[in-house]
Amino acid sequence: MHSEVTPIHHYKKYWAECFGTAPFLPTSREEMDQLGWDSCDVIIVTGDAYVDHPSFGMAIIGRLLEAQGFRVGIIAQPEWQTKDAFMTLGKPNLFFGVTAGNMDSMINRYTADKKIRHDDAYTPNNKGGMRPDRCSLVYSQRCREAYKDVPIVLGGIEASLRRVAHYDYWSDKVRRSILLDAKADILLFGNAERALVEVAHRLANGESINKMVDIRGTAVNLAQVPEHFKIIDSTRIDQPNKPFVPSNPYEVETQCATKGDEKEEAQPITIRPSRHDAKTTAVRLPSFEKLVNDRILYAHASRVLHLETNPYSGRALVQRHGDRELWVNQAPIPLTTEEMDFVFGLYYARVPHPKYGDAKIPAYDMIKTSVNIMRGCFGGCSFCSITEHEGRIIQNRSQESIINELKEIRDKVPGFTGVISDLGGPTANMYRLGCSDPKAEANCRRPSCVFPGICHKLNTDHKHTIDLYRAARDVDGIKKVVIASGVRYDLAIESPEYVRELVTHHVGGYLKIAPEHTEKGPLSMMMKPGMGTYDRFKELFEKYSAEAGKKQYLIPYFIAAHPGTEDEDMVNLALWLKSNNYRCDQVQNFYPSPMCNATAMYHAEVNPLKRVKYKKPEKVPVAKGEAQRRLHKALLRYHDPANWPMIREALIAMGKRHLIGDRPECLIPEKDSDLVTPAQSRKSGRHGANRFATKHTHSQPGFDALRGNKSGGQGRPNSGNKSNQGKPAGSKPTGSKPTANKPAGNQSARSEQNRGQQGQRGSATGGKPQGSGRPASRGNTQRQPQRAR
């Protein structure tokens, strides 16, 4: 369809290819000397420790440029107070590549409640504070101080999701595009391999960076828009039509049909060009200055942006910032399977740089034996920015490429035990799924392929995933393949054979899934399926677990305080948790990360998923105050005695006193108990071994003995006694998730909404949407989607 796109492995290599492949990309002058380099062509500045592994951005981008023949150096986590650290490798011949790392630096540094974190999984020994706030901006400014005439190419997830004027949760205001604040020359959004290779080769050929205004997947700062583009104005919401002027019924007509003598001549047929030709049309967003003080207009701008994300039919965007024009080119064309295999088939040492010695890097330990099999997500969850970053079209690796990486892990990773920790990506089961109609895919503007029901054109056959799992199990030296990425259970129930394969061979006792909520209001704002879909998956999960003779459990994840969630919704969710014997040790409030639809809801308090109007906009309830956010979080931990006073006060205020007491249908007891807190009951403090656990109670025989609890669960039910609780299960990471093995440092920003972990079966509480299949027109039961982790 786009034959004019040059494959990333078909460019003529730069002359420096004669130096060959480096064991590690150099991080010092001494290493450059050992390689025989007098200078670097490209220097990558990153906020993460340098790990030469394809799940880390600096490695995959560095190795890709190296494969093009360029000499690439790495400056990892430099001291940012002065320019000195940015000059350690000398002046790059072509450009500085600046990235904050695999995670947004603000999400990495602050919790959803804006409290400072004291750890950093991407830093040796988990040490916090090794990168500045707004990392991309600071690094760019220091690079400019070091060498004023060297082009700065901005990339990574932090820059990608801030490419236009955006709401900034941490300062609670709308900020300019990061391209203007950082004073960089060009911004690459998405995974960006295609754009980066083109920029590098054009610079190597002597072209000025200022001339590169037409590269897909880039944003540039211009004085005026290109002349050959037609601009569609979307800066206003309620555009008034021309006023209706009634005609005078008594007016005498001087010309009429009976008086006409002239005969009309035949006119030539002309074909009017489409006004929506993506190649010659751009959409003007409201200016930054207007968005600062107009929340409704901000929601409108967010909606327009999300409608223009299709790489084939989406148009360029232009936004005024003062006297400058921010020009955002069309989204990049997805990589083909051949290109994906090329990127992941490059040489990687698969270990941290030797300069770190024996220091532990938690993010690396988490993904060192996992394999990324695909990119992208068509789920469209409103709180997730994976689609905005990686795209809606799934980019797949071949089975052969994946199997080769499994063998490489077996042979190269120190201490490999034979267990593959994950085969996945943004989600576990979208491998080789997609639209069955290429023409429809090229023109589709739906924000989700699975909400409110699965599109009838979506191929949901999991055959390729099943074949991949079986081939992975047959690799010599591989004892176990675990699926740790979140499963899209709404897709999984379309293929029961996949559920059987997954449950029988690839679940390590617990399986993560993400219903996110139980109530219709929040679920509709999240663009997630109803609990009927969850119940159907749970039935299949339990059925196939029993057939395999295994005791296995679902670990659902929930988000508190998401836009669209009211206090009563959280009470109903808490009742659902209690009725299903779930106790959540660690939960997560909604985190408004840049560019998400849910972030626009949070800021504007209206629904950007539908047409936005000034007159009677669809209001969305938002928990913004600290007290309400604390309450929503506390309700997910209804079993914690420390939360009972707050919950008790809220229930009384809501007129739900009947939920207070010792009866089975009550949520919390009438009086506080002297029983220990959940942290004390598991014999650990805030940083204990079970800190991230979610517990399923009463349903795991014999587990009390494993916990050293011989009393067998004495005490008042649901009063805070944890003696009956089950095993700890893994928690979701914050921000873009390294654990799910996302590609190349652009670990999507699933942000850290999803640390909350709970629930298992639907109850009668609340008004939850039901259904577990395709729309009725497909001949199946109703079904609504979910967004997997």
Swiss-Prot record:
Query: Which intervals hold domain Radical SAM core?
Result: 363-642
For whether the record's keyword set contains Heme, the answer is: no
| InterPro entries linked | Elp3/MiaA/NifB-like_rSAM, Methylthiotransferase_CS, rSAM, rSAM_horseshoe, UPF0313, UPF0313_C, UPF0313_N
Q: Binding residues for [4Fe-4S] cluster, per the UniProt record?
A: C377, C381, C384
What SMART domains does the entry give? Elp3
Polar residues compositional bias: what residue ranges? 716-726, 733-763, 778-789
List the molecular function annotations (GO) for this entry. 4 iron, 4 sulfur cluster binding; catalytic activity; iron ion binding
Region listing for Disordered, in residue ranges: 669-789
Which keywords does this Swiss-Prot/TrEMBL entry list?
A: 4Fe-4S, Iron, Iron-sulfur, Metal-binding, S-adenosyl-L-methionine
Q: Which cofactor does it need?
A: [4Fe-4S] cluster
| UniProt cross-references to SUPFAM superfamilies, sorted A to Z | Radical SAM enzymes (SSF102114)
Instruction: Report the co-factor binding details.
Output: Binds 1 [4Fe-4S] cluster. The cluster is coordinated with 3 cysteines and an exchangeable S-adenosyl-L-methionine.
What Pfam families does this protein's entry cite?
DUF3362, Radical_SAM, Radical_SAM_N
Basic residues: bias regions: 683-698
Extract the PROSITE patterns matched here: RADICAL_SAM
Entry coiled-coil feature ranges: none
Tell me its family. Answer: Belongs to the UPF0313 family.
Full protein name: UPF0313 protein VC_1711
